[in-house]
Amino acid sequence: MMQRILAGFSALPGADQAYIISRRDGLVASVGKRGRAPMVEHATQIIQAMERLGQNKAVGRGLEFWTEGEEMLLVTRLSEDASLIVSGKKGGRIARWRHAVECDVEMLNSLMR
């Protein structure tokens, strides 16, 4: 079921990959184009930066992060331990990615337990 949900994310306009990483377990699941490895190290660094920023009381906890440009990336916290990453190329529609994630986040959380 988790692979099916991730496949749906990777089929979104402009998306190439969707994967879940965990602090404890590393790469949990991944779906994407052949020959393209998930950017686990890059995503982990972003998540760690979000956690450091969240230690500032004025900012609060970061639940989502996205970048747009030649490469697009959406990082969504699923739990304290796990995060979902959707990545792709220029021309992706972050708003559609975010909406799709929002619709399936509860299902993903239940599968992660």
Task: Set out the residue ranges of the language-model regions.
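Acidic, low-complexity cytosolic segments
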Residues: 1-17, 23-113
